[in-house]
Regions:
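Short acidic/glycine-enriched loop/turn segments that link adjacent beta-strands
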Residues: 34-37
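Surface-exposed cleft-lining segments at the edges of enzyme active sites
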Residues: 3, 58-61
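Short polar/acidic secondary-structure junctions
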Residues: 32, 45-47
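Structural signal for conserved beta-strand scaffold positions within catalytic alpha/beta enzyme cores
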Residues: 29, 54, 90-92
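Domain-level recognition of nuclease-like catalytic cores that cleave nucleotide substrates
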Residues: 3-7, 87-173
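Conserved catalytic cores of phosphodiester-cleaving nucleases, focusing on short active-site segments
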Residues: 20, 40-42, 49-59
Length: 173
């Protein structure tokens, strides 16, 4: 099962890189968590934009990003002072197959493939240190802390290859 998940992640990362690489953008897959770097770095040198991207894909209702992976993205972004616009992006891909359990057996049902690209701000500097960030299939995002989960509205980032962004109204509790 681990290899399937890992391959799913690599495929999603390569998909993002290949869609980003064009006349204006250059993107590279860096190897991710095993080497202490973001999954992907992308730059637009004409507009001085740098993206540090952490990518997650899966068949469940929720995808999670541990805080250490987000912190690595911020540490890389801080290194590049030349870039006027620097963003840490969490990329989430919910696959067409939704994994469900029936009588302790995994099964799949069909659903629409969706992708979200969320701009993450260094929220833990405001006193909340999350253990991880969670994104649900509907695009809602949450900080997971020792005290529980807090819904937070991270802005969508329009990737250069996206035609439109689906917006969701998120209510704070």
């Amino acid at each position: 099962m681990g290899n399937i998940r890992r391959n799913r992640g690599y495929n999603y990362e390569y998909s993002i890189v290949s869609r980003l690489n064009n006349r204006y953008w250059t993107a590279k897959r860096l190897g991710g968590s095993s080497v202490g770097l973001p999954d992907i770095i992308a730059v637009n040198n004409n507009k001085a934009i740098l993206l540090a991207i952490e990518a997650k894909s899966g068949t469940g209702e929720s995808l999670y990003v541990p805080s250490d992976q987000i912190e690595r993205c911020f540490s890389i972004v801080k290194m590049f002072r030349y870039y006027k616009y620097k963003y840490v992006i969490l990329a989430f891909k919910f696959l067409r197959k939704k994994r469900i359990k029936i009588n302790n057996k995994s099964s799949y049902e069909k659903r629409k493939l969706v992708e979200y690209y969320k701009i993450i701000e260094p929220i833990w500097k405001k006193g909340r240190i999350p253990q991880q960030i969670k994104c649900n299939y509907d695009g809602k995002t949450f900080l997971i802390t020792n005290q529980g989960s807090i819904e937070i509205n991270f802005c969508d980032y329009k990737m250069p290859f996206q035609k439109k962004i689906k917006k969701y109204q998120i209510k704070y509790k």
